[in-house]
């Protein structure tokens, strides 16, 4: 039995999802009394220049680099068993060895497909349990390695795909993707309507426009939607200050029809009152939408995991996928008018959702390492406390 285990969570800053999952797991471990938890961006610390270049190329995949990313994602999938696997397995290895020597972790978790640890296990024989937490509704071969002890995946579909490519079923646990605990609280929606000055008698369209590549014509689209009766449009611009300032002028023409926000810390609050949401199909965003049963309109998925996520949610009846700018207004307006379709999509989201995935993952890891959790009460957010 490990009395006070040290947990090392390896991640990478390609988008916010991998890091967000790492932070959620870190918080969950701490809630269960495991205080010694380290989150490390292994690639960023090992090769900062290469990482900056690849992050830039990753962001360009949302605009001019879609075909390049398609070639990378699906091309690597086909040739992964050859030379690329050997090169990638050693990426970050020097920094990893120093990290393991300095920190001496008892448990290693990957929220990004980093196979340096299992490869090091294979080559040196070190004994340390390694867990991979997949952050999409699909799987790429780059996540798979014989020295990984267990995989935590979003759905049974992902598990079946992994079994088909040779991963033993007993090594795969269907838990869902870890999301922030705020998405699993019960909150009185009336408080949210008042906080954001929204009308509970109108439908609400949420546009998450801060994400990379979401809707190049947000301003024109908002102007079109403002003419739709009994509809309020809420746009979250994130850290895109230029977009926010551009939309503020539009909002001033009809502040009841359009609400514009920058970065919203508790975005789950807006999820709870929206009728449907336009967004990009990132694994974490879709998991959060599933938790609160929000029908989604997925805008122009990038080839790779985004496209795989979008196709899965479309097959399940939980999403409408739009691949052409000219379709956005018409398809969104039609969906907002179709209450039966919206209800069916909410039910589909409910069927996809797996409750408390972070707890499930952490409890499984602690049990396998014979660690007894010591739950620490966490104070609920102020808005959640107002629920009656």
Curated annotation (Swiss-Prot):
What is the reaction catalyzed? a 1,2-diacyl-3-O-(beta-D-glucopyranosyl)-sn-glycerol + UDP-alpha-D-glucose = a 1,2-diacyl-3-O-(beta-D-Glc-(1->6)-beta-D-Glc)-sn-glycerol + UDP + H(+); a 1,2-diacyl-3-O-(beta-D-Glc-(1->6)-beta-D-Glc)-sn-glycerol + UDP-alpha-D-glucose = a 1,2-diacyl-3-O-(beta-D-Glc-(1->6)-beta-D-Glc-(1->6)-beta-D-Glc)-sn-glycerol + UDP + H(+); a 1,2-diacyl-sn-glycerol + UDP-alpha-D-glucose = a 1,2-diacyl-3-O-(beta-D-glucopyranosyl)-sn-glycerol + UDP + H(+)
Keyword Manganese tagged: no
Q: Where found?
A: Cell membrane
Q: Which CDD domains match?
A: GT28_Beta-DGS-like (cd17507)
Task: Spell out the Gene3D superfamilies in the cross-references.
Answer: Glycogen Phosphorylase B
Class of enzymatic activity (EC top level): transferase
The free-text function statement in the UniProt record for this protein reads: Processive glucosyltransferase involved in the biosynthesis of both the bilayer- and non-bilayer-forming membrane glucolipids. Is able to successively transfer up to three glucosyl residues to diacylglycerol (DAG), thereby catalyzing the formation of beta-monoglucosyl-DAG (3-O-(beta-D-glucopyranosyl)-1,2-diacyl-sn-glycerol), beta-diglucosyl-DAG (3-O-(beta-D-glucopyranosyl-beta-(1->6)-D-glucopyranosyl)-1,2-diacyl-sn-glycerol) and beta-triglucosyl-DAG (3-O-(beta-D-glucopyranosyl-beta-(1->6)-D-glucopyranosyl-beta-(1->6)-D-glucopyranosyl)-1,2-diacyl-sn-glycerol).
Q: What is this protein called?
A: Processive diacylglycerol beta-glucosyltransferase
What does the organism's lineage look like at the top? Bacteria, Bacillati, Bacillota, Bacilli, Bacillales
């Amino acid at each position: 039995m490990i009395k006070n285990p040290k947990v090392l969570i390896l991640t990478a800053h390609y988008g916010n999802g991998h890091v967000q999952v790492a932070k959620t797991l870190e918080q969950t471990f701490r809630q269960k009394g495991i205080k010694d938890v380290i989150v490390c961006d292994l690639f960023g610390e090992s090769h900062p220049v290469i990482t900056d270049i690849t992050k830039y190329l990753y962001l360009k995949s949302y605009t001019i680099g879609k075909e390049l990313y398609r070639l990378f994602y699906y091309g690597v999938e086909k040739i992964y068993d050859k030379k690329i696997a050997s090169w990638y397995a050693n990426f970050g290895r020097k920094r990893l060895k120093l990290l393991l020597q300095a920190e001496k972790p008892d448990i290693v978790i990957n929220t990004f497909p980093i196979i340096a640890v299992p490869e090091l296990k294979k080559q040196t024989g070190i004994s340390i349990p390694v867990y991979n937490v997949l952050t999409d509704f699909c799987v790429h071969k780059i996540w798979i390695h014989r020295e990984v002890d267990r995989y935590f995946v979003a759905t049974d579909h992902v598990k079946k795909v992994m079994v088909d490519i040779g991963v033993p079923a007993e090594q795969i646990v269907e838990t869902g993707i870890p999301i922030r605990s705020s998405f699993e609280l019960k909150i009185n929606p009336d408080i949210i309507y008042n906080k954001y000055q929204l009308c509970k008698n109108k439908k609400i369209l949420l546009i998450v426009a801060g994400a990379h590549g979401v809707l190049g014509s947000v301003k024109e689209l908002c102007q079109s939607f403002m003419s739709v009766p009994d509809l309020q449009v809420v746009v979250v611009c994130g850290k895109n200050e230029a977009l926010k300032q551009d939309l503020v002028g539009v909002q001033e023409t009809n502040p009841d029809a359009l609400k514009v926000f920058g970065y919203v810390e508790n975005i789950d609050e807006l999820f709870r009152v929206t009728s449907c949401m336009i967004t990009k199909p990132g694994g974490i965003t879709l998991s959060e939408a599933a938790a609160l049963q929000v029908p989604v309109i997925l805008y122009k998925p990038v080839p790779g995991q985004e496209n795989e996520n979008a196709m899965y949610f479309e097959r399940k009846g939980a999403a409408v996928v739009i691949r052409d700018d000219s379709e956005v207004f018409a398809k969104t307006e039609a969906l907002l008018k179709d209450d039966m379709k919206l209800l069916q999509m909410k039910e589909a989201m409910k069927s996809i959702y797996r409750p408390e995935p972070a707890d499930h993952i952490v409890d499984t890891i602690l049990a396998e390492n014979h660690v007894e959790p010591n739950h620490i009460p966490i104070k609920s957010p102020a808005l959640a406390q107002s629920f009656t």
